[in-house]
Structure formats: structure tokens, C-alpha cells
Design a protein with these regions (language model features):
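Active-site-proximal or metal-binding-adjacent scaffold patches in catalytic folds
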Residues: 1-190, 200-236
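Walker B catalytic acidic pair
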Residues: 196
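Walker B beta-strand of ABC/ABC-like P-loop ATPase nucleotide-binding domains
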Residues: 193
Length: 236
């Protein structure tokens, strides 16, 4: 019996069966969705993946190239965001190194001796540390709020620098979120938090799961679409 891979070219493979008559592939965020008729067997799904392997690989390369084109310079004046609010990087020399938010500026201090690529690397590191710290605090607040509403009890919350996914929930109720998520507007962040908490009720992406998400986020389809369209820019 053929086994459907869980991951392909860095994308999570998600099979969605329905009453549809044809099979189709979509790349949505960090997921490769295979939408097939109910009658289609796993072996046929594997054949579809093998047939479309070149297309999938080329799409992944295309998305990676888009991210490279939008590569950051980490210089003063460069724009960042926090819950949809525009912030601007301001690089200073000397004093205590690190990043702090003052008004609309991410004040990032580096050593005078750090120049060129080393300076960019340090600025990136300081910014990521700041974002991770902020993400943990803000996401913990949102998880606590929505876990009471949804009536689930997550065991642990972590923040990581995921390359493709926005969040995850394992079978022990441990939640992990991408720190880049807090660059999105609040309603988008709320959607991802609700999404992962609903996985504590239903681990897959079945119709029942999406019905649960809709109970707590009636506009989840719009939020999901926004994330698909703007996700690559948030990851920068």
C-alpha cells in the first residue's frame, strides 16, 4: 500500500477529500493541499504527487526567489511592523547593544567596531531576539484568553523562527508559534491562535475542525486568505 508523504519540498502535505469530481493541488502558505474526490485512494494520491513533482518543486523555488528579492538590508529607515503597525529601524552605535521600541522606532544599538556583513548579522539577531520576546508575551496573553473561550487547556507555549509554518499543536497540547506572526494585524494573529487551539479538539483539518474554527472566528476564511497573500512579506 502506497504511503502519502507528510512533507514534500518543505511543504506539509494535507489531503482534503470531498464530493468534488476532480483532483487539484494548491500551495497555501506552508501547506501543499491535495483536494480529491472521496473515492480516490491513497495510491492514486501518491501518483498525483509524483506526476506533479516538477511543478511543486518549481513553485517552491519561485517562492524562495521572491523572498530573496525582498531581502532586507537592516539599515536605518527600513520598515518593520508589529500587529499591523508600521515601525522603523534606527541603528545607533555604542552603548548597550540590543533592540528596544521607542515610539515608532526600533532602536537597535551595535558596537562601533561592527561593520559590513557583521553589522547586518548583529542587527538581525537583535531584532529577532526582540520580536521573540514580544511574541511570547503577546501570544501567551491571546492563548490564555481564547483557551478559556474554547475551553481547552494547552500545556505549553513556545515561540520559534519557523521558515514556513505559522503555528503547530502537538498531541500533548503544546503550542508553538512563529515569531513573525506578531507582525500581522491582531485579527490575523487571533485566527492562528484559534486555529491551533481548535486542534486540541480536532487534530486534523476535517469539516468538523473548520466548523469549530468558524464558531470562534466567523471571518476565518478572510483571515486565512490574508495570511496566504501577505505571509511571505511577514517572514522577511
Amino acid at each position: 500500500m502506497s504511503v502519502i508523504p507528510k512533507e514534500l519540498f518543505g511543504l506539509r502535505v494535507e489531503v482534503l477529500r470531498s464530493k468534488r469530481k476532480t483532483s487539484v493541488l494548491y500551495i497555501i502558505g506552508d501547506e501543499l493541499q491535495i483536494r480529491v474526490p472521496n473515492r480516490v485512494r491513497d495510491r492514486k494520491i501518491v501518483e498525483i504527487l509524483e506526476t506533479k513533482e516538477r511543478w511543486i518543486r518549481n513553485k517552491v523555488i519561485q517562492l524562495q526567489n521572491q523572498r530573496i528579492t525582498n531581502k532586507r538590508e537592516f539599515i536605518s529607515g527600513e520598515s518593520f511592523s508589529l500587529f499591523g503597525r508600521n515601525l522603523y529601524l534606527k541603528v545607533l552605535e555604542g552603548g548597550k547593544v540590543g533592540t528596544q521600541l521607542i515610539d515608532d522606532y526600533l532602536i537597535t544599538t551595535v558596537r562601533i567596531s561592527e561593520i559590513g556583513d557583521l553589522r547586518k548579522s548583529r542587527i538581525k539577531t537583535y531584532l529577532e531576539k526582540w520580536y521573540i520576546h514580544e511574541a511570547y508575551q503577546k501570544l501567551e496573553e491571546k492563548v490564555m484568553r481564547y483557551s478559556k473561550i474554547i475551553r481547552v487547556s494547552p500545556r505549553e507555549i513556545k515561540v520559534r523562527n519557523y521558515k514556513t509554518r505559522w503555528g503547530s499543536c502537538d498531541n500533548k497540547g503544546r503550542l508553538t508559534f512563529n515569531f513573525h506572526l506578531i507582525k500581522a494585524p491582531h485579527e490575523i494573529v487571533d485566527y492562528v491562535v484559534i486555529h491551533e487551539l481548535c486542534h486540541m479538539i480536532q487534530p486534523n483539518h476535517s469539516k468538523f475542525f473548520w466548523n469549530e474554527v468558524a464558531r470562534f472566528d466567523p471571518s476565518f476564511k478572510n483571515h486565512k486568505k490574508w495570511l496566504k497573500l501577505n505571509g511571505a512579506d511577514l517572514m522577511r
